[in-house]
Amino acid sequence: MQTLAQLNSGKYSDITHLTLSENLTEFPQKIFSLANSLEVLDLANNKLTALPCEFSSMKKLKILFLTNNNFKSIPEVLAACPQLEMISFKGNQLSRVDEDVLPTGTRWLILTDNKISALPHSVGKLSRLQKLALAGNQLQQLPDSMQNCKNLELIRLSANQLVTLPDWLFQLPKLAWLAFSGNKLTRSVQPVIDQMTSVSQQDFQLKQKLGEGASGIIHQATWLTKPITIDSDDDIAVKIFKGEITSDGYPIDELNNCLQAGEHKNLIKVIAKIMSKEQLALIMELIPQRFYNLGLPPSLTSCTRDTFPKSATLTTSQIIKIVLSMADTLRHLHENKVSHGDIYAHNTMVDENANMLFGDFGAASNLKVLPATQQKAMQAIEVRALGCLLDDLLPLSLHLENTAQYQALLIIKERCMQADTFKSPTFIAIVEQLKVHV
């Protein structure tokens, strides 16, 4: 663990990554001694309210985390940082974002869980912006200038005050991951969560932790008192939501969208819920131990794209089977008016035979609230996400580039990832194309 005392003693000269979390109320001046080397500065979980004017002297700084501090506005000095491209003000007290306070080279901007009611017109100048996290604010509309953000691939708009979504949003040429649940436009939809069986925390015993995501922690558990209406094994999985708001939106929306999605052979089956003042949780069937995560989450460098262990390999036949299963699952979701919003290898479980299970509806959205044209465009956006998944998997099939199967997958990938949403294939068409090559 890095400490302020060690920083002041000169121990950290020439380091590239610094993390300090000591309830700081003022920016440590000693950090400027690292201006020629520091690339990542993590000052999350402090009590900072401002940055000094000299902050622009951090010439090599690329990544800045100011999560869970007390900022009420974004310091304008950030715009003068020449290499700064990833910025997080998650969980602060931001009520506004002023014009021209962000570096034009920003690629990844996290403003989740603040009180922002409007974005500045200057956000349209962020031509390199790929990832934008805005969930848990008070946005009523998006500035039209954002249609100039042609490199935007992922945007989280959940848990705001949006009444409509602009048509230009669905026409962004690289957009592949979009979430908008928990806005005013979604409140007209009748909740379906009441149809799910409810259980209490006393009905099961938690065991070991299985995993953790943006919205919750998953544990293995065993039924102590299984309701007679539930047909499941004694061993189950329990997803306990972390709080009222996550980076993807409201947990209650995840529950509703998960239920509306219905059952499919490749979806992790949901069997019950816990809804109380103390806790919100989802009860799911336990995934067999032979399944493992297909990929790892994006890194600070890859931004929107998943990462993979160096040892990861797949045959083209396995890739076809996985992508075919995913395309058919997404066909099912969109027929049930649900978009997933988080189509990634790291949310996908597979076994050695390329059998696939898919879950995590934290970024899902109810498409019933959209006009028909936007519903169709939303499918095109998720088709692009499927293309990105295929693009991530193809490099894992080493030395198979010249095979007919590989070339066929390349063509499908290019069709999925094309910029024009009006020319995008449907999931039904993709399923039929892939079946030819099984």
Predicted regions and their residues:
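Activation segment signature within eukaryotic-like protein kinase domains
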Residues: I322-V323
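Catalytic-loop of the protein kinase fold
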Residues: L330, H334-V350
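Conserved hydrophobic beta-strand positions in leucine-rich repeat
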Residues: L18, L41-L43, L64-L66, I87-F89, ...
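ATP-binding glycine-rich loop module of kinase domains
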Residues: I217-N257
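Protein kinase glycine-rich loop
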Residues: K207-G213, I218
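Short beta-strand micro-motifs within the conserved protein kinase catalytic domain, predominantly
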Residues: K269-L280
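C-lobe/activation-segment region of protein kinase-like
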Residues: L357, G362-R415
